[in-house]
């Protein structure tokens, strides 16, 4: 018996939408029918994912790479850095406004994001982008010191709350095994590393070093658990774009170290680059897995780690006295990747596919 033979109530018959039915596997007879009316899905603001902050995060990282390259007095480097930084801060302001509105209009959705094993970790991108903006902008705009201090404090508190939830879930075995992804690095490891950069920009070097050490400790605690999951097989398709975060701990750690200790030798940075290459090879070895899923904004997870890798390469070249061309090529390659990500993201936006379905 076809599904349309099931009688629907008069109100249901008059509603345009998608009809589905349940079928008894033994008799092949439909047992029930439901209707999802058109236009009753979640509001687009309620579907705004925290992962969109990864776009800002990657652009900020790229701006930082070009700024470091400008130390070689290459043409246009300062202009490119300023342009990318302006784009990133403008987008950050837009997303912050949208998320504030979402918090007041769709608070239940925000609570769901916070409680979700993966979205909760990705939510840490919000304070991460704020702290990275502080570290990049404050040196050239010291008149905003008080504002930067307040933003950094608020971001660290939010970051700490998210990191506590992630660590407690892992420590108590409450996190489902299929939800273990590299995104879990973001709250405890990323928060400590980027927080250290922000505190250093505020002149709190000692606190920055302490936070840097806490981030390294969190990296050591999480590394075995996450690698064990990655070596066990492919992640679920929706989670595969988060694989880019696996690249982050080593290059970002070295970038922070180079920031905290300006006289750090180039050889130390080379060690960090070598460790970073190991993670890069491991991620590339799984390319069939993460390229088998459709493109989404989640692939911006690759952007900041690669930008950090380029920044460390620039610092190694500058401190080691090596050919400037090496640094220039590194930044250009990362710029090409981010331009590609931006083009694909704009295409999703035009097609109305940037946000998850309602």
Describe the predicted segments one by one.
Residues 83-94, 146-160, 206-219, 267-277:
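Structural signature of hydrophobic alpha-helical transmembrane segments
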Residues 66-80, 137-147, 195-209, 257-268, ...:
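Helix-coil boundary and interhelical linker segments in multi-pass alpha-helical membrane proteins
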Residues 99-107, 135-146, 166-171:
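Transmembrane alpha-helix boundary signature
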Residues 32-65, 81, 85, 107-132, ...:
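Juxtamembrane helix-loop boundaries in multi-pass membrane proteins
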Residues 10-16, 23:
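Acidic, Ala/Val/Gly-enriched low-complexity intrinsically disordered segments
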Residues 162-166, 196-198, 221-230, 252-259, ...:
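Alpha-helical transmembrane segments in multipass membrane proteins, preferentially the mid-helix core
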């Amino acid at each position: 018996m076809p599904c349309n033979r099931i009688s629907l109530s008069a109100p249901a018959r008059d509603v345009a939408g998608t009809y589905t039915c349940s079928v008894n596997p033994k008799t092949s007879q439909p047992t029930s029918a439901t209707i999802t009316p058109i236009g009753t899905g979640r509001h687009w603001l309620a579907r705004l994912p925290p992962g969109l902050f990864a776009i800002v995060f990657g652009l900020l990282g790229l701006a930082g790479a070009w700024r470091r390259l400008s130390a070689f007095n290459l043409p246009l480097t300062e202009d490119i850095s300023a342009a990318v930084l302006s784009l990133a801060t403008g987008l950050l302001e837009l997303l912050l406004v949208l998320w504030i509105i979402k918090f007041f209009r769709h608070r239940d959705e925000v609570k769901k994001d916070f409680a979700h094993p993966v979205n909760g970790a990705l939510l840490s991108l919000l304070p991460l982008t704020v702290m990275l903006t502080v570290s990049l902008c404050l040196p050239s705009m010291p008149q905003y010191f008080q504002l930067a201090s307040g933003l950094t404090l608020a971001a660290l508190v939010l970051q700490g709350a998210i990191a506590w939830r992630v660590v407690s879930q892992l420590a108590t075995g409450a996190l489902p095994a299929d939800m273990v992804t590299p995104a879990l690095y973001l709250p405890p490891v990323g928060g400590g590393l980027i927080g250290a950069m922000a505190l250093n920009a505020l002149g709190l070097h000692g606190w920055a070093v302490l936070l840097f050490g806490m981030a390294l400790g969190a990296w050591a605690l999480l590394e075995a658990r996450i690698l064990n999951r990655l070596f066990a097989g492919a992640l679920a398709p929706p989670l595969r774009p988060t694989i880019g975060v696996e690249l982050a701990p080593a290059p970002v750690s070295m970038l922070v170290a180079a920031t905290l200790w300006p006289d750090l030798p180039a050889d130390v940075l080379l060690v960090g680059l070598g460790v970073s290459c190991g993670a890069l090879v491991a991620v590339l070895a799984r390319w069939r897995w993460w390229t088998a899923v459709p493109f989404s904004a989640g692939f911006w997870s690759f952007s900041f780690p690669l930008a950090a890798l380029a920044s460390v390469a620039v610092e190694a070249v500058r401190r080691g006295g090596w050919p400037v061309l090496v640094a220039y090529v590194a930044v250009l390659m990362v710029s090409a990747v981010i331009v590609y990500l931006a083009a694909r993201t704009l295409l999703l936006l035009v097609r109305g596919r940037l946000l998850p379905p309602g």
